[in-house]
Each structure stands twice: as structure tokens, then as C-alpha cells.
Amino acid sequence: SILLESSDYGVNDNSVAYICFNPIADIKLQNQMLSMRHPDGKSKQIQLADNERVAKYCSDFAKQFSGNFKSERFVSNGLFGFTSYDAVQHFEDIQFSEKEEDVHIPQMYYALFQNVIAINVFNNEAHLYAHCYQTKNNLDEVVAVLQAPNPTTHSFSRQGEPHSNLTDDEFVELVKKGIHHCYRGDVFQIVLSRRFSQPFAGDDFTLYRVLRSVNPSPYLFYFDFGDYQIFGSSPEAQLVVKNGKAEIHPIAGTFRRTGNDKQDAE
């Protein structure tokens, strides 16, 4: 199940949240293997060569599905999921050096969900969709769950101390190296990062709710795929496709948001 939402409810355009559950088909890229699962239970696996492109595979997979209805206001069907940074080598001519990976999650995962709930928070209304393949409509069951009493919230607590894959000194050396390459003209920008890990006990969705309450970023997401969960936030949309046009919004401190869409556009 996944949750896509916005905390920027000041205008109608940014007021839609999506809840998707009951995946009936999916496409996954992990360890050079592209796996596809279809609603009829059939599956297919393709062993990829180094840097083999997957865009056409993804496009062909998505084109197999269509719905009987379309909404101009909401995304009522389609594939929902994520593409990690490391997947870029299967879309562009970029070669990564081999590294020991201790986070075993797919580089890319998209699913076709049987149920999609589009919530217009601005108007306080919800639209429920069911995509059925040789199965009966389950909207009555979904409505029953929504009308049930609110579930119990669970606690969240840290266990032990946080740790990182880099020490402070090691990270400082990386920054110096990045500055050196900028001065040389090899690159105009380098985004450096380090990973922090924190053991915990409790419900990670509680942590997401805390992030949502304190983070000013308008776009937030929570993905629960059973074996792993991914959640976070973004200051702005990186790619927007609307009315047949695609807009790219670089994310690197290039655009200051005021909270007022009209003022931001000016």
C-alpha cells in the first residue's frame, strides 16, 4: 500500500492525496533482474545486461492496462511506485562502480493497484476506484473499512544510538574533494550525502506522521511494501506532466517557495 499526499492545502491544485492498496500487477528491477507480474497470475523475468535500458520494458508493461473510465481531476489508474537513484544506469549511459550493498530493496518498483482512493482535502471529498480483472467489485468492502472506528495508533521509540556509514572526518574529506572537482570544472554541482541508521521499536508510520507535522515540504510519501517501507518528503515536484506537456523542476535550491502558488509563479 502507498500514500501520496501534500501538506500544501492552500490551493486546490495541490490538495489531492492518494491511497493505493491491493496490488494486482507490478514491475520490479533488482540485482540486474527485471521482474513483471500480471493480474492473471503469470510472471516474467528478464536478466539484464550491464547498463541495458529498461524504459521500453516499462512502457510496454504499462500499455497493457487500461480502465473503463478516466478522470481529468484525479489519477484514477496507472502505475504507482518509485525509481531509486541507482536505477539511472538503466536509463542513461552512466556506469556505476560496484559497491557492497546492505540495503536490499529494489532499484525500481511500480504496481498497478486494484484500489485507489483520491482525497480532495480542499473540498473534503473522496473518490473511490476499483480496477477489477476477473474479480467482482470490492468497493462495498472498502467503504466498510473507511466507516469503521479509527485504528489504534502505536508508539515509536528509539533503541540505542544512531550510527552512520561515514565518520565526520570522512565526510569532510568528501566535501573537499567535491570542491576540488568544481574548481577544476569537472562538474558544476555535487550533491554529497551520508547515511544515518537508527534502531527503533514501534510503528514506523508514527514516525512518518511526526515528519509530516514538522517538515514544511509540500509533497510527502509513505510506501509500505511489506518487507520494507520508504517514506520522506520533497520541496517541489521534479517532473510535472499536464495537458500533454512535461515540465522539469530542478531541485537544488533553485526556487524559493513562499506557500503562495501565484507569487511563486511570478
What are these regions, as identified by a protein language model?
Residues S1-E266:
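Extended alpha-helical targeting/anchoring segments
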